[in-house]
Amino acid sequence: MAHVITRINAREILDSRGNPTVEVDLETNLGIFRAAVPSGASTGIYEALELRDNDKSRYLGKGVQKAIKNINEIIAPKLIGMNCTEQKKIDNLMVEELDGSKNEWGWSKSKLGANAILAISMAVCRAGAAANKVSLYKYLAQLAGKKSDQMVLPVPCLNVINGGSHAGNKLSFQEFMIVPVGAPSFKEALRYGAEVYHTLKSEIKKKYGIDATNVGDEGGFAPNILNANEALDLLVTAIKSAGYEGKVKIAMDVAASEFYNSENKTYDLDFKTPNNDKSLVKTGAQLVDLYIDLVKKYPIVSIEDPFDQDDWENYAKLTAAIGKDVQIVGDDLLVTNPTRITKALEKNACNALPLKVNQIGSITEAIEACLLSQKNNWGVMVSHRSGETEDVFIADLVVALRTGQIKTGAPCRSERNAKYNQLLRIEESLGNNAVFAGEKFRLQLN
């Protein structure tokens, strides 16, 4: 029996930062299937276009009524009557025909908006899973050509200290994460992470005062830390105090494009201070040396966005220097885009992809980006955005694609824990068929 789409309705809802985003209800004979899309704070210039209204009289210009209108008036009439199990056909129709906008890196979604297209793409996936009478993660595995008899539960990368564009402190690096690779299961990994998180909170309160334990957009703390060493020392202390030394490692998201000066090709590690300390302005080569020193001193297993999104040369230098032992993740560099992934492969610029579905704008393209990365023995980290919703799609996606790692914030704030809680449910439902990535999080079963 064909399960055709009978109705599509889009609406404007609020994300976790209080900004509007797109939610879609898609109806078939089996029911209503809902999806909501996230948005990022530090976005790469090569990401697919997130369509905003720019009407300053509503939501300070951040409304998404244009994207809603595009769904209800342009996309919906074309999709009604189509079979919800035709994921690739529907995604291609939206991306290539109904939108059709392109740039040098591929389909840009600048006409209809990646937020409009992705919301429908996710809802179609949920409807397709129901039509096939399987869970969403099993259906996504089928779409990706993965075997569905053995699923991999990811290591959670929990963002517990915030800096950069996510915080009001002086810290230039954006995220410091704890990575419980030594746990025997996802359930235990989450427990390790939560215990380290609460221990860290106590350490911060003791050292910086109670005000320093307020949480940021992703649930992490933003104490008045001045540099990366101070943040890393705090994490090492918290991990040790919680009893998980050796079992919980550290990851960083530097988001270096946020403090890169393209005119003189330098990185300002004091970019949040009006009269910055000139000794903290570094060349790319100096930054390479800084990362190498940090990796020697601390149990760092992953560094994301260590350089600007166009600084291919220093990416390649760092990957050559420490890539064997440390995951070098290209976020703003790659923006989940297969064309940019191909360029990075040619240049040996990095060795891991952060998979953010809203950077590319459709589930079909996101799966393609993941498979291309895995085929070339890269790590793949499925990732949230700083502006999230209660939608848990990425939890099913990470299990389906067997990437072995997920980044979706601290074990705090409901829009973050919603994803972790969904992973607990999936692990429980899989029983003995669940494999936890653990120490092998970089290269999982493909």
UniProtKB/Swiss-Prot annotation:
Lineage start: Eukaryota, Sar, Alveolata, Apicomplexa, Aconoidasida
Family to which the UniProt record says this protein belongs: Belongs to the enolase family.
Quaternary structure and partners: Homodimer. Forms a complex at least composed of DegP, ENO and HSP70. Interacts with G-actin. Interacts (via the DKSLVK motif) with mammalian host PLG/plasminogen (present in the mosquito blood meal); the interaction occurs at the ookinete cell surface and is required for ookinete invasion of the mosquito midgut. Interacts with A.gambiae EBP; depending on the Plasmodium species, the interaction is either involved in ookinete invasion of the mosquito midgut (P.berghei) or is dispensable (P.falciparum).
InterPro entries assigned to the protein according to its UniProt record, in alphabetical order: Enolase (IPR000941), Enolase-like_C_sf (IPR036849), Enolase-like_N (IPR029017), Enolase_C (IPR020810), Enolase_CS (IPR020809), Enolase_N (IPR020811)
Domain notes: The pentapeptide insert motif is required for the stabilization of the apo-enzyme in an active closed conformation, independently of Mg(2+) binding. The motif is also required for homodimerization. This motif is only present in Apicomplexa and plant enolases.
Motif DKSLVK motif in this chain: 277-282
Cross-link type Glycyl lysine isopeptide (Lys-Gly) (interchain with G-Cter in ubiquitin), residue numbers: K138
Phosphotyrosine modified-residue sites: Y139
Record CDD domains: enolase (cd03313)
Pathway: Carbohydrate degradation; glycolysis; pyruvate from D-glyceraldehyde 3-phosphate: step 4/5
Cofactor(s), names only, from the UniProt record: Mg(2+)
Catalytic activity: (2R)-2-phosphoglycerate = phosphoenolpyruvate + H2O
PANTHER family: ENOLASE
GO biological process, one term: glycolytic process
UniProt protein name: Enolase
Annotated residues for binding of Mg(2+) 2: D253, E304, D331
Keywords: Acetylation, Cell membrane, Cytoplasm, Cytoskeleton, Glycolysis, Isopeptide bond, Lyase, Magnesium, Membrane, Metal-binding, Nucleus, Phosphoprotein, Ubl conjugation, Vacuole
A Pfam family the protein falls into: Enolase_N
Cofactor note (record): Binds 2 Mg(2+) ions per subunit. Mg(2+) is required for catalysis and for stabilizing the dimer. Unlike for mammalian and yeast enolases, Mg(2+) is dispensable to form an active closed conformation. Inhibited by high levels of Mg(2+).
Modified residues (Phosphoserine): S42
Subcellular location: Cytoplasm; Nucleus; Cytoplasm, Cytoskeleton; Cell surface
The keyword Ubl conjugation is assigned to this record: yes
Broad EC category: lyase
Matches recorded under SUPFAM superfamilies: Enolase C-terminal domain-like, Enolase N-terminal domain-like
Modified-residue entries (N6-acetyllysine), positions: K133, K375
